């Protein structure tokens, strides 16, 4: 490889890393503001999830440049995991405060470290172990302060969402499945289950709820 090619390769790596950080920041901002949007939608959590996923499906298809999907085992497993993560988070926002839900979901790095060690047999670095210990202590104090039944259930669902997000992160990295593809299948799964919930508990549609759902998507 010539000097020019090496310089170009290094520049591309820097740009790629910067882009990844930008996506992480945008994701954090999106998740952090989702909790407030949920409060404007007084629907069944399954219906909320289905409505936002319906919009998300088209966004993912456009970003991917194709709406074709393979319903292979890796894709279906990823779709189920993604659906479960989203549904737990939506339900948590209905049963506890938005701040509680997002803080507990953001414990997922701790579970990434634990699952990498337990399942993938990857040795954790010292800083990862320290981070995990601090987060575990924080969670313990958090639940000691939130003993009311309603909040406790919501907090547990938010914690489950964090665990499932960690599983989803590792699955996306090591399964070899197309992340956007199984994300689209997850959207279809959510819409199908949400359609059944609409029959049993029809939502009251308002302009505010529609704007909030589009924002959530």
Which stretches of residues belong to each language-model region?
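Glycine-/small-residue-enriched transmembrane alpha-helix faces in small-molecule transporters
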Residues: 1-47, 77-80, 88, 133, ...
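Hydrophobic transmembrane alpha-helices of multi-pass small-molecule transport proteins
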Residues: 4, 60, 82, 114-117, ...
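Specific transmembrane alpha-helical segments of multi-pass solute transporters/efflux pumps
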Residues: 30, 35, 67-105, 113, ...
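Juxtamembrane helix-start motifs in multi-pass secondary transporters
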Residues: 48, 179-185
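C-terminal ends of transmembrane helices
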Residues: 59-70, 110-124, 166-177
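Loop-to-transmembrane alpha-helix entry segments
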Residues: 69-75, 102-105, 121-141, 145-155
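Membrane-interface helix caps and helix-loop-helix hairpins in membrane proteins
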Residues: 91-96, 144-152, 174, 200-207
């Amino acid at each position: 490889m010539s000097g020019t090619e090496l310089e170009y390769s290094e520049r591309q790596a820097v740009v790629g890393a910067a882009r990844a950080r930008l996506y992480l920041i945008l994701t954090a901002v999106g998740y952090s503001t989702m909790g407030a949007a949920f409060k404007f939608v007084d629907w069944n959590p399954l219906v909320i999830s289905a409505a936002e996923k319906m919009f998300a499906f088209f966004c993912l298809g456009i970003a991917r440049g194709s709406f074709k999907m393979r319903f292979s085992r890796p894709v279906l497993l990823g779709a189920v995991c993604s659906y479960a993560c989203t549904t737990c988070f939506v339900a948590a926002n209905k049963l506890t405060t938005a701040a509680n839900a997002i803080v507990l979901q953001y414990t997922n790095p701790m579970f990434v470290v634990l699952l990498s060690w337990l399942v993938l047999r990857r040795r954790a670095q010292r800083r990862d172990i320290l981070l995990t210990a601090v987060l575990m202590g924080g969670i313990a104090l958090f639940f000691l302060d939130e003993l009311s039944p309603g909040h406790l259930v919501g907090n547990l669902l938010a914690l489950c969402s964090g665990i499932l997000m960690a599983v989803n992160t590792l699955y996306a990295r090591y399964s070899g499945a197309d992340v956007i593809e199984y994300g689209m299948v997850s959207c279809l799964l959510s819409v199908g289950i949400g359609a059944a919930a609409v029959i049993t508990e029809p939502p009251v549609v308002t302009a505010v709820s529609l704007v909030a759902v589009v924002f959530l998507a």
